[in-house]
Amino acid sequence: MDERPCAIYHLLFTLYHSKQMSGKILSRGALRAERERLRAAGKLLVFTNGCFDILHVGHVRYLAAARALGDALLVAINSDRSVRELKGAGRPIMSEGERAEMLAALRAVDYVTVFDESSPRSLIAEVLPDVLVKGGDYRLDEIHGREEVEAAGGRVLSLPFVEGASTTSIIGRIKAVTSDK
């Protein structure tokens, strides 16, 4: 069987998707410039952050709800180093590059950036989004960057948590299935 059509399809698929996603995954410098462009156009920027390790339906629903709150959604993900610091050895399961690419592939997500700090507070202070959101497992007073966003006239919201949809529970289910063998 001739494998050239499959190889050509794979190459075209990869080129198309990397071009589509490369414009969504931004460095901090590019993010600052994009934020100024959005601000000048009068567009509302929504910001959220997290590890997003093992993307699941709870993430997808949460991000769609967050995107509906403004004109553009920025998702800031923890670097691999900061995920290890927060979650412990063996995490993240997916590398920061893989997590960024998967998030960038979602229609609801306009921009993705990676931060290496343990808290996104300095990034939030740089970007000053119009809306800052976290999942319902956070109380408003626990959301990093709340003070900065509110002081600039922005809103801070906690969106409902999707029960049973968590990376930790998925990892637990996988371990249970594999330990039975």
Regions found by a protein language model. Name each.
Residues 10, 16-180:
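Nucleotidyltransferase catalytic core that binds NTPs
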